[in-house]
Design a protein with these regions (language model features):
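PDZ domains, with a preference for the canonical peptide-binding region formed by the helix
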Residues: 264-290
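Small-residue-rich helix-interface/hinge motifs
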Residues: 6, 10-86, 116, 120-190, ...
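Alpha-helical transmembrane segments of multi-pass membrane proteins
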Residues: 18-22, 216, 220, 387-395, ...
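Conserved PDZ fold ligand-binding element
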Residues: 103, 109-110, 251-274
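Hydrophobic membrane-insertion alpha-helices, especially the h-region
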Residues: 16, 211-229
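Terminal peptide-recognition signature
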Residues: 25-28, 66, 251, 259-262, ...
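Short amphipathic alpha-helical interface segments
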Residues: 84-112
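Functional transmembrane alpha-helices
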Residues: 2-5, 174-207, 231, 235-246, ...
Length: 453
C-alpha cells in the first residue's frame, strides 16, 4: 500500500509541476502571438484530446480550456505549418460565396480533386479563416478532417472573431453566411496569411518562438526571488553549537547530540564553527580524539576515533535569513547562468555523456517533485524554479522541433533570403524527433535504475 501511495504521490506532483510549467511556456507563445496580431484558435492546459472543458472567448475567438491529458499544454497559433497549397485562394473564395459547402461540391465546382480541396481546407482551417460545419446531431470524427465547411463571421474589412479588437462585431455577418470579398482571391488570401505566423517578418517570428523560453526563465527567476525574500534562505551560523547529528554517525555513537556546545576538539579550544571544523580536520586520522562539550549547563567529554576519510557526522546550527531584493535577484540570476552553462556543455562532445548522466526524465522529475513537496512549499517551489530554467534553456537548443531549432531554420531562411523547402524542414524535424526519442529512452533507463531498481 505504501508503495502505491508513493507512486501516486510522485505521479501527482510530477504532472502538476510539469503541466503548469509547460502551460506557462505555451502561455508565452500565446501572448506573443496576440501582441503580433497573429490568430490563436485554441489555448489549453493538457494535451489535445476529444474530451475537454472549454470556453470560447467572445472578444478574440480563442477557445480556452483543459483536457484530461495533463501532460503540459498547447497554443494553436495559426500558420505554424509551412505547407503551401496552390488552390487555397480559389477554395477560400468559393466557401465565402456559398456560406456553407461540402468538399465534394467544392471539388466539382472548381474542377479539383477532393484531396486537393481537403488539403486547402485543412490549411485554411489552421489559419482561422474558415470553420467546420456540422449539422444537428453530427459530431466530429477523431483523426479525420471535416468534409463540410462554413464561413466565419466577417466585417466589411474582412476581419473575423480571431482578430480581436479590429473585428467590428456590430456590422459583421453571422457564421455560415455568404460574404462578398472586398478584393480579389489572391489578395484576400494574402490578407488572411498576414494574420498568421507565416505572414509575419523575421523579428516577430523570432519573438513568438522565444516568448515561451523567456516566460520559463522569468517564472523561475521570480519564484526564486520570492522564496529568498519571503520564505528566506537557511544559512549556517558560525557558532560552536551543533545544529544536527547524523543518525548512526561516529558523533552519535559517542553520545553527542544536536544543541551541544563544542568546547574543544583534541585539546584545541573552539568558540566558532570554523574552529570546530578546522580542529576536526587537523585531528582526523587519530584513534583517541578528545571532545569536550556542554549540554544543559554541564560539561561532558568523550573520545572518538576518526579515520582521515571519515566524517564525524555533525552539522553547524542554521538560521533563516530573508534576503533583500537586490541580493535575491543576484542569487537567482546565478542559477540562471548555471543552468545555461549546463545546457551549453551538453553541446560540447567531451561533456555530453557527463551532462546526460546528470540529467533526468519525467520519471526522475516526478520522484524528486514528490520529495520536494514533502520537504515543504519553499523546497517544492525552488525545485519548480530550477525545472523551469531547464525547460526554458533546453527549448533553446538548435534542434527541431524545439523552439531553438525552429529559430535556427528562421535564421537560415533570413540569411538565404528564401524559405527552406518543405521536404528539407520535414526531414530535419524527423531527425530531431528521433534524437530526442533516443535521449528520452536513455534518461528513462537511467531513472529506472536510479529510483526504482
Amino acid at each position: 500500500m505504501d508503495t502505491v501511495l508513493s507512486v501516486l504521490s510522485s505521479v501527482f506532483w510530477g504532472l502538476l509541476m510539469l503541466s503548469v510549467l509547460v502551460f506557462l511556456h505555451e502561455g508565452g507563445h500565446f501572448l506573443a502571438a496576440r501582441v503580433c496580431g497573429v490568430r490563436v484558435t485554441e489555448f489549453f492546459l493538457g494535451l489535445p484530446c476529444r474530451f475537454d472543458i472549454h470556453h470560447t472567448s467572445r472578444r478574440i475567438g480563442t477557445k480556452f480550456g483543459v483536457t484530461p491529458l495533463l501532460l503540459g499544454g498547447y497554443a494553436a497559433i495559426c500558420g505554424m505549418d509551412p505547407t503551401n497549397v496552390s488552390c487555397a485562394d480559389r477554395v477560400l473564395a468559393a466557401i465565402y460565396r456559398h456560406g456553407r459547402v461540402t468538399v465534394p461540391d467544392l471539388a466539382a465546382e472548381l474542377e479539383l480533386s477532393e484531396e486537393d480541396v481537403l488539403e486547402a481546407c485543412a490549411l485554411l482551417l489552421g489559419w482561422g479563416s474558415i470553420a467546420p460545419w456540422y449539422e444537428e446531431g453530427e459530431k466530429p470524427s477523431p483523426g479525420y478532417y471535416p468534409t463540410k465547411y462554413q464561413t466565419l463571421p466577417r466585417d466589411a474589412a474582412g476581419f473575423t472573431t480571431f482578430d480581436g479588437r479590429r473585428f467590428d462585431r456590430e456590422h459583421a455577418t453571422a457564421e455560415g453566411d455568404a460574404w462578398e470579398m472586398p478584393c480579389g482571391e489572391a489578395e484576400f488570401l494574402a490578407q488572411e496569411r498576414s494574420h498568421t505566423y507565416l505572414g509575419q517578418g523575421f523579428l516577430k517570428r523570432a519573438f513568438m518562438l522565444l516568448a515561451g523560453i523567456i516566460v520559463n526563465i522569468l517564472t523561475g527567476f521570480l519564484l526564486l526571488m520570492s522564496i529568498y525574500s519571503i520564505a528566506g534562505v537557511t544559512v549556517p551560523v558560525d557558532t560552536n553549537v551543533i545544529g544536527q547529528v547524523d543518525e548512526g554517525s561516529i558523533a552519535a555513537e559517542a553520545g553527542i547530540e544536536g544543541g551541544d556546545t563544542i568546547l574543544s576538539v583534541d585539546g584545541v579550544s573552539c568558540s566558532t564553527w570554523m574552529d570546530v571544523y578546522d580542529a576536526i580536520g587537523n585531528a582526523a586520522g587519530k584513534d583517541d580524539i578528545a571532545i569536550e562539550y556542554e549540554r544543559d549547563g554541564k560539561q561532558h567529554s568523550t573520545t572518538v576515533a576518526l579515520k582521515e576519510d571519515e566524517r564525524l557526522g555533525v552539522y553547524a546550527s542554521t538560521q533563516v535569513v530573508h534576503l533583500d531584493p537586490i541580493t535575491s535577484a543576484r542569487l537567482s540570476f546565478s542559477y540562471v547562468v548555471q543552468t545555461a552553462e549546463g545546457v551549453m556543455r551538453l553541446l560540447q562532445p567531451q561533456h555530453t555523456m557527463e551532462i546526460l548522466d546528470q540529467s533526468t526524465s519525467i520519471v526522475g522529475i516526478s520522484v524528486m517533485s514528490s520529495q520536494a513537496a514533502a520537504a515543504g512549499p519553499a523546497t517544492f517551489l525552488s525545485f519548480a524554479a530550477l525545472i523551469s530554467f531547464s525547460l526554458g534553456f533546453m527549448n533553446l537548443l538548435p534542434i527541431p522541433p524545439l523552439d531553438g531549432g525552429k529559430l535556427l531554420i528562421e535564421i537560415i531562411q533570413k540569411i538565404a533570403g528564401r524559405e527552406l523547402p518543405l521536404k528539407v524542414q520535414t526531414i530535419v524535424s524527423y531527425v530531431g524527433i528521433a534524437l530526442f526519442a533516443l535521449l528520452f529512452v536513455y534518461m528513462l533507463r537511467s531513472d529506472i535504475l536510479r529510483f526504482i531498481l
